[in-house]
Amino acid sequence: MAITAYDALTERQKAPKVLLINDFAISSSSSSPPFFNLAATFRDNIRSFLREYAEIEDYTIDGATVSTIFLGSQANGVVFPLYIIEQQISDSSPNPLCDFCRCFGWGHHYVTKRKYHMIIPNRDEWNEPLKRESLTLSSHLMHGLIHCNGFGHLLCINTDLDDPNHLSGDQIMDFWDRLCSTLHTRKISLDDTSKKGAMDLRLLHGVAYGRPWFGKWDYMFSHGSFGVKKDLYWRAILTLSSIEVDKILEELSGTSKGRVMKKIIDFYRGSTESPLATLSDLLRFMLGFISKAPIERKTAMALVAMSLDHVSYPTLRADENSEVCTSPDQESDDNGYESGRDTVLDDHNTTTSGIKPPQYYSFDDLSRREHSRWPGRRLNDAAQAVLKVFKERNSTISRQDLREAVRSSIGDTGLIDFLLKHIDKVLIGDQIVQRSTNPKSRMLQFSLRTINSRVQEQKRKKKRKVKPQETSECTSTTPGLSPYDDILYLYQNLLLTYPDSDLYSEASQVILKCKSFVKEWSYQEQNHLTVSCQVLPNHEELLRDFTRLLPPGDLVAVPENATIRELKSAAEKVLRDTYCITETFEVLEIRNRYLEKLDDNVSLKSQGNTEFMVKGFGLDIGTELRYEGGFDDWTVDCKCGARDDDGERMVACDACKVWHHTLCNSIEDDEAVPSVFLCNMCYGDSLRSKKRNLSIR
């Protein structure tokens, strides 16, 4: 297929280089091959990559250099841009610390001197320059952030099915994996909130394949939220994946769900000669059935119909648009009307036909479920500014006009964009803001509608754990006609709410609480030794200034015949180039894993070891750019077992200052945190103190 260049490429005065992706598809192994060989660590490779292939743009973002690399996909003939924004970190940087490191458990890492945003924007933004808010949006086709020490985060992966030349989620993910392999990244984290329509892929693929969707690229379990550990996660996977299909049919026989389930299972069992003995076998085959060509599915349906009674069965219809995304800031824009909801909107002054019912009943709920980087309180304050504009104008307002009208009172354009994208999903008192498209200009516009008392009644009855809608009364269809609907039926009625079994439902919740996954790369340069050098502060500094876990060592490449003296020089150069706190650090000695000091003239290779400790002086203990998680020490000790920030909503005890999950303390997501909060221990101490005072009196 011929390469199709987009407008931004052809408008360039100088023809830029195009990096052709010859194998832009899933490779046979789970680890994708590099584009080409770079023989250095990430901090050096990223510089070489930019120097060789990138074109520097004529604008900056908050002083950060923006470069563009053009890539050509031979899979679908598309040339697309990869923007790389290099942020130099200093005390004056707008966002020098990393919230993603803090939430992932890397808050003890030293603050790096450079970090690189790697962005493939949406297709309709390829001709536009990036903006400041581009660094916080999660609607890009791809957005990754990598620190110059090689640790990074995959923030989002999205697909645009409306684009005929769209890049699939698998293609984008394969590109990202190969890019990381090429540049020699060390570890990449991600927050897995990927979905297929209404289904969480980490649950669906976890049961079907024993791994999340990202597991195809070797992303492995890191830690769970709410204190979930690795062994509990794997037990939950095993519990659900090993459910026997015959047991399901037996336990549900005689029920309406059982009859529907049997028709689905009989069809797919009749479509293969392989025994579909377990739920894992069944779901894996059904997921493969989706990828078959329509003619193959129709043939299978005809063959099965010859051996089975042809029946229709009820199932739940759902949006079949696929979206795969990740990060603490993920956004999803689904404007389809969800049939089956019984929420009624009512505005006596305007028509309400086709208005989408609200998905959330508070901004706290929206903030949590849409993974907003802004708390519910800020979203609510911003929404009030939007309502004020509607009250002043009393008319339908275009998106651009509304955005400009609230900028003076809100200021944060990223917050404005996020709110306008999701505001139609939330009730604001007895009103809701409707998004629609102007039929003439085709531009997005907003209007304010009033809802009736029935919605308010639904809001009062809404509980935290809302079970999925019963699906036995929904639209009829035929097994195999829509494999997605067949899978969704099993997902809703087996994985989420297995009848009369708390064991299986709890196992599903354990898997859903596990969103943090990580991939680690390892490599060794040819004709060089690559060793890890970890800074070891002196005893006084450890007691006074470096109370957290020491960050991992940095990779240092030296010749194979290097001595300890040469390693000292190379390590000092690497540390000064990488971290703010080691900018003036001088290496005095190298120690082995047993903390034994090594002589300068000793051959490095003779040590038979690749991990060393580095001691010296010159650590900048006065800088606030010490830890990626921030300068302040704070303690998490929740009753669920969590001992670190896991990205979930928390509240600090006003007495002991220890942080706890709000949900673990009966504070619902749509509830405000009380003005005074005491944890169970401090509350008990307070009661005992009051009793003592009363007894003394």
UniProtKB/Swiss-Prot annotation:
Residues 339-349 have a biased composition (Basic and acidic residues). One of its GO terms (molecular function) is zinc ion binding. The keyword Zinc applies. InterPro entries: Zinc_finger_PHD-type_CS (IPR019786), Znf_FYVE_PHD (IPR011011), Znf_PHD (IPR001965), Znf_PHD-finger (IPR019787), Znf_RING/FYVE/PHD (IPR013083). It is found in: Nucleus. GO terms for cellular component: nucleus. The keyword Cell inner membrane does not apply. It holds the Pfam family PHD. Residues 319-362, 457-478 are annotated as: Disordered. A zinc finger (PHD-type) spans 635-685. Keywords: Metal-binding, Nucleus, Transcription, Transcription regulation, Zinc, Zinc-finger. This is PHD finger protein At2g01810. It comes from Arabidopsis thaliana.
